């Protein structure tokens, strides 16, 4: 060890002038936020104004500065990459070259911004040739993005080493964000904007200029939908309208193909956007070899520089339509997930179609205003010079005499400015009051400019400049005139570059699917502890007064008990959360419909469960894409977290993680919340706590969450309820021994999370532990199911309203040894207003009739 080493470490010694102590959690959080915002604003998301990310903008500006324009010769890509990296973008050369190459690909960009020469990749996924072999220059339409950039139209900032200035945004003569689209993944967010037809986008922008109150539907009269560079077909228009109206949507894109029934051949002419042709052919061949697709004997790729042509030869006797449908199910259709996310004033925002165009127009108005101010200043300067020249020509003899008799050039200028007096033979010459700029110009005039013809030209130019000044002042003083300039320039761009649509629309008729054959109806779904699952129509369970035994709802094998029951619609999407913290997705109609006396089907045939995994909570909705807000989850040991619903849009068949769990903990309940709800957590021992949802910050799927309630002893969480005061009036609690109560929401005061809470219901020997806690409103019905498979349906109004810390009333009459297993609410919208309550005897009689009907059905 060196003898120079210090004996002890002193804070700050040899490190910094000041050492600041900080909690590592705070430092990590702030550093991560800084990193995230750097990625969001500096790399991954496009600016709404010019539709470019920084790397695209820097490449184009570097080419502009180097003179690599559309009318210049091509330059080596390595040279362009080097200049971009050296002057503006200090990152890896491969990232810059990949971006440059993509801007040159006509199958990636609807209107390529780079004119490439050489191998820049292919639709088969072939990579571009090395940058030393390829050459590039700006395309003509790319120059429109930089037009007037030298007229103070946009702000500039210092480059990374303060040597040069770079634009923060390009002037952008057309709405490039919509025209060429964009995609990127940032921290916690992503963007995926499809390309569009330039002519349609210009027409929509002009419509918005002329009619600022235009709706999305009005704009869609011009913009029919995405226009992909690879063509293909968009299936239906509803998804497109939703994407334009909300900024998010899923658009189905189908390959364009021809079916030749007599020849036994299917020919694919166009592929969905971003589909890899080589991989598509490989996947089809694999499915044919594995027997998943029948009737195909050969696949040939006959594509050339004129377009795509994939020929699928059918076996003798194979039905072309059947094979086509198999291909559509697996290969010839893809989904383009629209996320119209862009930077607005440096902040990421999801934008509607109208908002996107409005932000572009705001930018363009600013550009045209600044350009007009710049040109006005130049015109006024020129008019000032011309005015001086005209005055000089009117007094040419005196001006020449003054200059000739001045001792120096500076004296001549001073004399023209009227600052000194010039004498000839003792007599003073006339004085002038030219400005410094005029004097400088007059002194520099050549004798040839003193001709009468030159004077006429100066006067004509002066009149033209005055007209220009008047025009520019009109533009700057009248918003409608400024908008007229924008409109005219947009239409010029359209005339120069617009082309026909490549992507067509096909009706969303398609083939008859299983879903088309299943009627929409409200159903009760029952899940057992051994993961047997089935569904039954809600109509099979007639409402009765509380205190009844209900009717048989399912058959159970020995040792099995009911785990959960919930009410949904056959066409709903189901998110099935398990005790292991996983979530799975399926359609409600995928759950087999069976009689009340049937056992059900093993859920492992529907969901890929691990050993010991069982469903503990289900969230259902009309369409998974329509869920907005958060999924709020609670665990058995009192942890709670909420995660944005957008994190659950693409759930694998094997499930995905919904929440991280500590060893020995389990996920017990999940609620959909809107970000402004109050939450009530209930425990098995009858405690409850109400707090604002904002106290639980949004987290990712793999986070554990925070403490929601402080549990005492061996108490555990029974469930969570979200309060929507517009629809909910009471908290309804049910215990395992069949007792329950309704309590007004006001009885549960709001506290801070992680408290012990208040007594909700007495969980004594008579009542037993709490089984479920729900929020209910007028007209709602309750579905209560016991361990042994009995189901009771009763209106919530039939259950007494009492305070907290009370015993409650009998809800379900249980047989000895039986217990309440699960409770769910039938919303008032699902109940029939004219429905009459049955007493227990009539329910038993109906049960016998239903059982006979079920037996006949089976």
From Swiss-Prot:
Gene3D superfamilies, per the entry: 3.30.1360.40, DNA gyrase/topoisomerase IV, subunit A, C-terminal, Topoisomerase II, domain 5, Topoisomerase, domain 3
Motif stretch (GyrA-box): 544-550
Gene Ontology annotations of biological process type: DNA topological change; DNA-templated DNA replication
PROSITE patterns reported for this sequence: TOPO_IIA
InterPro entries: GyrA, GyrA/parC_rep, Gyrase/topoIV_suA_C, Topo_IIA-like_dom_sf, Topo_IIA_A/C_ab, Topo_IIA_A_a_sf, Topo_IIA_dom_A, Type_II_DNA_Topoisomerases
Active-site positions on this chain: 133
Basic and acidic residues: compositionally biased ranges: 849-858
E.C. code: 5.6.2.2
A Pfam short name: DNA_gyraseA_C
Keyword Nucleotide-binding: yes
Annotated spans, Disordered: 833-858
GO cellular component: chromosome; cytoplasm; DNA topoisomerase type II (double strand cut, ATP-hydrolyzing) complex
Domain Topo IIA-type catalytic intervals: 45-517
Broad class of where this protein is predominantly found: cytoplasm
Biased composition (Acidic residues): 833-848
Keyword DNA damage assigned: no
GO molecular function: ATP binding; DNA binding; DNA topoisomerase type II (double strand cut, ATP-hydrolyzing) activity
Location of the protein in the cell: Cytoplasm
Record keywords, A-Z: ATP-binding, Cytoplasm, DNA-binding, Isomerase, Nucleotide-binding, Topoisomerase
Additional record remark: Mutations in DNA gyrase result in novobiocin resistance in halophilic archaebacteria. Few gyrases are as efficient as E.coli at forming negative supercoils. Not all organisms have 2 type II topoisomerases; in organisms with a single type II topoisomerase this enzyme also has to decatenate newly replicated chromosomes.
Function: A type II topoisomerase that negatively supercoils closed circular double-stranded (ds) DNA in an ATP-dependent manner to modulate DNA topology and maintain chromosomes in an underwound state. Negative supercoiling favors strand separation, and DNA replication, transcription, recombination and repair, all of which involve strand separation. Also able to catalyze the interconversion of other topological isomers of dsDNA rings, including catenanes and knotted rings. Type II topoisomerases break and join 2 DNA strands simultaneously in an ATP-dependent manner.
Family matches, as NCBIfam families: gyrA (TIGR01063), PRK05560.1 (NF004043), PRK05561.1 (NF004044)
Protein's recorded name: DNA gyrase subunit A
Organism (species): Haloferax lucentense (strain DSM 14919 / JCM 9276 / NCIMB 13854 / Aa 2.2)
């Amino acid at each position: 060890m060196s003898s120079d080493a210090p004996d002890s470490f002193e804070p700050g010694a040899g490190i910094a002038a000041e050492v600041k102590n900080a909690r590592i959690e705070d430092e990590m959080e702030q550093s991560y936020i800084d990193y995230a915002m750097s990625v969001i604003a500096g790399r991954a998301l496009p600016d709404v104004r010019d539709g470019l990310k920084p790397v695209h903008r820097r490449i184009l500006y570097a080419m502009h500065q180097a003179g690599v324009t559309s009318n210049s010769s091509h330059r080596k890509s390595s040279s362009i990459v080097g200049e971009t990296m050296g002057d503006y973008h200090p990152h890896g050369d491969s990232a810059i070259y990949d971006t440059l190459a993509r801007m040159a690909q006509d199958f990636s960009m609807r209107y390529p911004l780079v004119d490439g020469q050489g191998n820049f990749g292919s639709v088969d996924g072939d990579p571009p040739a090395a940058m030393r072999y390829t050459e590039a220059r700006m395309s003509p339409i790319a120059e429109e993005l930089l037009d007037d950039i030298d007229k103070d139209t946009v702000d500039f900032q210092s480059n990374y080493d303060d040597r040069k200035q770079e634009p923060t945004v390009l002037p952008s003569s057309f709405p490039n964000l919509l025209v060429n689209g964009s995609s990127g993944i940032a921290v916690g967010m992503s963007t995926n904007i499809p390309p569009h037809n330039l002519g349609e986008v210009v027409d929509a922008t002009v419509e918005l200029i002329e009619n600022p109150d235009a709706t999305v539907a009005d704009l869609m009269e011009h913009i029919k939908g995405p226009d992909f560079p690879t063509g293909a077909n968009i299936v239906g228009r509803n998804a497109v309208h939703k994407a334009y109206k909300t900024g998010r949507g899923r658009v189905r894109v189908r390959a364009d193909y021809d079916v030749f029934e007599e020849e036994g051949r299917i020919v694919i002419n166009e592929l969905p956007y971003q589909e890899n042709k080589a991989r598509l052919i490989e996947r089809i061949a694999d499915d044919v070899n594995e027997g998943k697709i029948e009737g195909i004997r050969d696949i040939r790729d006959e594509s050339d520089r004129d377009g795509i042509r994939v020929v699928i030869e059918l076996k003798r006797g194979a039905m072309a339509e059947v094979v086509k449908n198999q291909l559509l199910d697996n290969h010839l259709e893809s989904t383009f997930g629209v996320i119209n996310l862009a930077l607005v004033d440096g902040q990421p925002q999801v934008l509607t179609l109208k908002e996107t165009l409005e932000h572009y127009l705001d930018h363009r108005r600013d550009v045209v205003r600044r350009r007009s101010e710049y040109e006005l200043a130049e015109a006024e300067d020129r008019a000032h010079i011309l005015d001086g020249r005209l005055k000089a020509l009117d007094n040419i003899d005196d001006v020449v005499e003054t200059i000739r008799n001045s001792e120096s050039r500076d004296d001549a200028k001073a004399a023209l400015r009227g600052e000194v007096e010039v004498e000839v033979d003792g007599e003073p010459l006339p004085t002038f009051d030219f400005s410094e700029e005029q004097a400088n110009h007059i002194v520099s005039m050549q004798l040839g400019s003193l001709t009468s013809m030159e004077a006429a030209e100066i006067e004509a130019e002066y009149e033209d400049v005055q007209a220009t000044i008047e025009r520019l002042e009109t533009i700057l003083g009248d918003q409608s005139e400024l908008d007229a300039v924008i409109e005219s320039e947009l239409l010029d761009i359209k005339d120069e570059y617009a082309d026909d649509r490549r992507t067509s629309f096909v009706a969303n008729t398609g083939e008859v699917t299983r879903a088309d054959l299943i009627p929409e109806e409200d159903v009760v779904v029952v899940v057992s502890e051994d993961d047997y699952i089935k569904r039954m129509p809600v109509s099979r369970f007639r409402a009765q007064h509380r205190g009844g035994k209900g009717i048989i709802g399912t058959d159970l094998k020995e040792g099995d008990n009911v785990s959960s029951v919930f009410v949904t619609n056959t066409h709903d999407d189901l998110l099935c959360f398990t005790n292991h913290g996983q979530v799975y997705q399926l359609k409600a109609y995928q759950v087999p419909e069976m009689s009340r006396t049937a056992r059900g089907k093993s859920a492992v045939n529907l969901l890929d469960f691990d050993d010991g995994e069982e469903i503990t909570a289900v969230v259902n909705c009309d369409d998974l894409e329509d869920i907005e807000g958060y999924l709020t989850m609670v665990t058995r040991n009192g942890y709670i977290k909420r995660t944005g619903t957008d994190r659950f849009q693409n759930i694998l068949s094997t499930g995905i993680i919904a929440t991280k769990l500590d060893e020995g903990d389990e996920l017990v309940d999940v609620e959909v919340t809107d970000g402004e709800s109050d939450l009530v957590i209930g425990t098995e021992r009858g405690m409850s706590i109400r707090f604002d949802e904002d106290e639980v910050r949004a987290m990712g799927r793999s986070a554990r969450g925070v403490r929601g309630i402080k549990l005492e002893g061996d108490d555990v969480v029974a469930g969570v309820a979200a309060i929507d005061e517009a629809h909910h009036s009471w908290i309804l609690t049910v215990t395992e021994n069949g007792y329950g109560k309704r309590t007004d929401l006001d009885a549960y005061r709001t506290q801070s999370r992680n408290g012990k809470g208040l007594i909700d219901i007495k969980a004594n020997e008579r009542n037993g532990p709490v089984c479920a806690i729900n929020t209910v409103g007028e007209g709602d019905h309750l579905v209560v199911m016991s361990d042994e498979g009995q189901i009771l349906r009763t209106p919530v109004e039939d259950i007494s309203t009492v305070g907290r810390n009370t015993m409650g009333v009998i809800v379900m009459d249980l047989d000895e040894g039986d217990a309440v297993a699960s409770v769910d609410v039938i919303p008032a919208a699902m109940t029939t207003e004219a429905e009459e309550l049955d007493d227990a005897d009539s329910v038993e009689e109906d049960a016998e009739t239903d059982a006979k009907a079920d037996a006949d059905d089976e």
